[in-house]
């Protein structure tokens, strides 16, 4: 049996990462593989949208540095409260891309203190294996076994003209192999392999839409069925959930159901 056709529960039983285990179990219990990307610039709108979308998602993806009125007390503490209320995990889309010592400091310190609240973050492979080791050290120094952290590598992007493909993507996969427990998977457009070597990588895919094919700014959208059939585990949706004229409650249900049905089809449960 390939990873592609195993259920989330089955994958949770054998996965090397506590973060991935928790996420798979959460997805199965909530019956959702939807990640909501909340890119807004005020704390009020950020928290209001998350409260509306929380029941439908397994993961909330943040770009915390675009919030103009950010503070740990008024932004992060309520975010953590909502994650407990609605039972979702948090993914800070930081895209680290520097030497190990620098990314460690960026991860644990500064204004945002990402390691203290984000279950998952991500990194480019351009600087080599050191980015993984630096972030892992930061996680170890600032968290406990009760709050494990995980890393996604950026193997492929959904934007027009992206340089993240081909040899770059393959080298990024090799970097991911350096740490089976901390690196939980990839931001990618398809399955990235690894099963024959004992890896079970989570694939999270942005650029998923049920209606639009692009946004005029380089984003390309693929359908839910299309991405899940080629290996996606979690669909990442942003403006499709709350853009102009869209009701987050209606769209949250719509994307949750579309993603879950695609998963059931892929695993032979539907």
UniProtKB/Swiss-Prot annotation:
A GO BP entry is:
uridine biosynthetic process
Q: Name one GO molecular function term.
A: orotidine-5'-phosphate decarboxylase activity
User: Which Pfam families does this one have?
Assistant: OMPdecase
Q: Where are the catalytic residues?
A: 95 (proton donor)
Catalytic activity line of the entry? orotidine 5'-phosphate + H(+) = UMP + CO2
Q: What is this protein called?
A: Orotidine 5'-phosphate decarboxylase
The record's Gene Ontology cellular component field reads: cytosol; fungal biofilm matrix
